[in-house]
Design a protein with these regions (language model features):
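Class I SAM-dependent transferase core
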Residues: 2-112, 121, 143, 317, ...
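Intrinsically disordered, low-complexity coil segments
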Residues: 17-24, 53-55, 166-176, 221-224
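Short amphipathic alpha-helical segments enriched in hydrophobics
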Residues: 22, 36-40, 183, 339, ...
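Residue-level detector of flexible, active-site-proximal loop/helix-junction positions
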Residues: 47, 141, 165-167, 211, ...
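Conserved nucleotide-cofactor-binding alpha/beta core module
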Residues: 88-205, 217
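Class I SAM-binding transferase module
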Residues: 182-298, 378-383
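C-terminal lobe and adjacent flexible extensions of AdoMet/dcAdoMet transferase-like proteins
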Residues: 218, 281-385
């Protein structure tokens, strides 16, 4: 207990050092202190060892377990692994604080949360909104039950429901419309049900595209919602989502030799480290996953579309790049075309992007709603040839 208290204080101090506690929402820091992370962490956590997730049990190694709970402010603690994939986590404190600040919950607000997980975020919401004001939807019955137990132990009055978050509140449940809606998992498309179940002027906050955090305000007539990207946020996708992790590259390539191969002169470092470019590519090429790494030779980048096409840029010791592609699409060319569009548009930053959602469609725009971002997935020329 003494070790946990020390880790809590250190975690709080580090958040203060990086200015992670939002000045506009002082209640968040108080709520976090009242509802510490360890009270919602299961006794088994999971740690990536470079090849697979391995269990870390509290009763076997309490020190390592506590270290995962109160580790980096920028890394989540994995709480469930199914089929080798992480499917639930205790979100990192910095992102939790950012999302709650964006949501702007007020006392008395009716709040819908999609993705209960450990129940910790729902408890923080209830701390602010008040008893009985939060409904949380969880697709996994086991996670939902464990969350109910933890919420009960901490005295948080939250109504946890098993259901599909994409449908929002089950029709038999109370509290429609909601003042605030928040998703704790990433989506590629904001479900219209979320907009329907939010009052005019209400707010929806969700991770989008596995990279950005979007805050939307529902229009006065309830027929649309719009808003801007608020920052970076890397969350797990919705269960059953077609969007796979960057690690899908090995599965998609499946050991096959390249169908196309050539050398090029490119500075690949922005593809790996420039998150403004990375977000733009996520918008322009929504089904292309990008991963990269840097070593003594330079930066290498891997692309895949989660199904049948892949590309790789391998850094060479002479400063050049070996470009390899396989599958029906020329992904290297598609990325180059999208990169050129971003450059020609003035290299818009993450915060320049906005989103509009209607019953018929939704789209991303830059600066003004009329400047609609294209989707560039065909007709690209090979890179460097």
């Amino acid at each position: 207990m003494r070790e946990l208290s020390s880790l809590r204080r250190a975690h709080d101090a580090e958040m203060e050092r990086i200015h992670g506690w939002p000045e506009s929402s002082p209640w968040i820091r108080r709520a976090v202190a009242a509802l510490p992370r360890d009270r919602f962490a299961p006794d088994r956590l999971w740690q990536w060892d470079g090849h697979a997730y391995v269990p870390v049990d509290r009763d076997i190694d309490p020190g390592q377990w506590a270290g995962l709970v109160y580790g980096s402010l920028y890394e989540a603690a994995v709480t469930q692994v199914i089929g080798g994939l992480a499917t639930s986590s205790l979100s990192c404190e910095s992102v939790v604080a950012d999302m709650l600040d964006c949501l702007d919950v007020r006392p008395g607000h009716r709040v819908l949360e999609l993705g209960t997980g450990t129940g910790r975020n729902a408890a923080l919401l209830a701390h602010r909104a008040g008893p009985g004001r939060v409904v949380s939807i969880e697709t996994d019955p086991g996670l939902a039950e464990h969350a109910r137990q933890r919420l009960k132990k901490t005295g948080a009055d939250v109504h946890v429901v098993v259901g599909d978050g994409a449908q929002g509140r089950p029709r038999a449940e109370p509290f429609e419309p909601f003042d605030r809606v928040i998703s704790t998992y990433a989506v590629d498309t904001v479900p219209w049900a979320w907009v329907e179940q939010t009052r005019p002027g209400g707010r929806i906050v969700t991770p989008w595209g596995h990279l950005g955090l979007v805050s939307l305000t529902v229009a006065g007539d309830g027929n649309s919602a719009r808003g801007h990207v608020q920052g970076l946020a890397q969350f797990m996708p919705a269960r059953g989502s077609s969007g796979g992790p960057e690690g899908d590259f090995s599965r998609v390539r499946a050991g096959r030799k390249p169908q196309h191969e050539h050398h090029a002169r490119l500075d690949l470092s922005p593809l790996h480290a420039d998150w403004h470019l990375r977000f733009a590519l996520r918008v322009l090429l929504p089904d292309v996953h990008i991963a990269g790494s840097t070593d003594d030779d330079g930066t290498s980048v891997w692309l895949n579309d989660s199904t049948s096409s892949w590309a790789a840029f391998y850094a060479q010791d002479d400063g050049g790049v070996l470009v390899c592609e396989g599958g029906p699409r020329r992904l290297a060319g598609e990325v180059r075309k999208a990169w050129d569009w971003w450059t020609a548009a003035g290299e818009p930053a993450l915060y320049d992007w906005g989103m509009t959602v209607t019953p018929e469609r939704q789209w991303m725009w830059v600066g003004e709603e009329s400047v609609v971002a294209p989707v560039l997935t065909a007709g690209a020329e090979p890179v460097g040839e």
